Amino acid sequence: MSLTNADETVTYDALIVGAGVIGPCVATALARKGKKVLIVEREWSQPDRIVGELMQPGGLRALRSLGMIQSINNIDAYPVTGYTVFYNGEHVDIPYPYKADLKPVEKLPGLVRDGNDKVLEDATVHKKDFEDDERERGVGLVHGRFLNNLRNICAAEPNVTRLQGNVVEILKDKKNEVVGAKVDVDSRGKVDFKAHLTFVCDGIFSRFRRELHPDHVPTVNSSFVGMSLYHAHMPHDMHGHVILGDKHMPILVYQISPEETRILCAYNAPKVPTDLKSWMTKDVQPYIPKTLRPSFDDALAQGKFKPMANSWLPARQNDVTGLCVIGDALNMRHPLTGGGMTVGLNDVVLLIKKIGDLDFSDREKVLDELLDYHFERKNYDAVVNVLSISLYSLFAADSKNLKALQKGCFKYFQRGGDCVNLPVAFLAGVLPKPLLLTRVFFAVAFYTIYLNMEERGFLGLPMALLEGIMILITAIKVFTPFLVRELIG
């Protein structure tokens, strides 16, 4: 089917700008609800990107709700059953939560059918393991292959029309309400396409997020440098690895296929060093676990570095009639916790529950529901987003108090029980309780203060009390402003 023949004489129910992870999910869900959908993407060929390679259990649960879980099949996706956190040579294993402790996965009417909420059997994803494991699972995957699967599921829907072109303008009427988009299409030029509701899903580098507000732009304070490791010997199979220490920035390692492992090395500035190889050799290589060193050293010698900026962007209300901004175009968090796709996919689930059965030509009714949607999404959105930025502050500790909190956090994990069960449930995107997150974060802070007092001893108590006050103030600074912004903004 041609990707340039979309009919501009039709008023579509929904026009979707962008076919990254979120766009095809919105398009598929709305099409299954009977909506006539046009989805526009600049380039439909498989991309090569290092974002969106780790899907937390909360994201997989959302794919099940949408009837799109089979998008992880037949792409050599690699199961993830939990995390291993390293700190100055010690480590602690943190498995994902038990399924019995969570609510059953919600099956959205009209979307889940014919077993499309269950994984298929393939070379790396074993149906029995995913469906019958007593614990939740995540998955590491090659982003481009996953995206192709999502796009193919979307393309199979008869109510979806795909268009390859560059969206150059969001169209508005005399009342300043959004009525569609102008698309530059090969061999056709600039064409106006009309729709009752236009979805902006154009991702991290969104051109159109500022249609909500001119100030809706992300903040960038840090970076990651990525490399591909091949045939790496992971310290713990089927685990994501977080490598911490008081002398280096956080290092993330997770397998994305049987052959390929992604390593992401944090750098605490918006722009990475000019001489990346020297920086990696000096500030990263000495802290890589022994089993990973051969594959790391090979990758370092090849010098194929992939830098990426880390953005933070709190969500704004979708208060423009005829417009819905969703995914990374709306809301971003630090990628340390791998929660981006989880938030975006849960947004799609909630969105479909709110507006999937509405008549989109009733634009005021749709707008009312979108305003409600903004507030209903805050619980899970706030947990994943605030956790990402506060954990990064601790794990990338650049002050005495933050280093104390970093050590205290690791020691807290070592206690086991709820000291790991609750944090990993937040990380997995399956415990949308921001007040409980607050309690756990400050439990870590007070445990850090206790450890410091114990280390100081009786004679050092006055100094320990002063340091405790400073540690508590630091904890408040790295957590509270972000929580308030997410919940109240």
From Swiss-Prot:
Required cofactor(s): FAD
An annotated Gene Ontology molecular function: flavin adenine dinucleotide binding
Record-given protein name: Squalene monooxygenase
EC assignment: 1.14.14.17
Pfam families: SE
Catalysed conversion reaction: squalene + reduced [NADPH--hemoprotein reductase] + O2 = (S)-2,3-epoxysqualene + oxidized [NADPH--hemoprotein reductase] + H2O + H(+)
Family to which this protein belongs: Belongs to the squalene monooxygenase family.
Subcellular location field: Microsome membrane; Endoplasmic reticulum membrane
Binding site for FAD: 21-22, 41-42, 49, 151, 167, 328, 341
Cellular component aspect of the GO annotation: endoplasmic reticulum membrane; lipid droplet
Main localization category: membrane
SUPFAM superfamilies, per the entry: FAD/NAD(P)-binding domain
Sites marked Important for enzyme activity: 83
Pathways involved: Terpene metabolism; lanosterol biosynthesis; lanosterol from farnesyl diphosphate: step 2/3
Highest taxon of source: Eukaryota
Gene name of this polypeptide: ERG1
BP terms from Gene Ontology: ergosterol biosynthetic process; ergosterol metabolic process
Transmembrane segments: 10-30, 426-446, 464-484
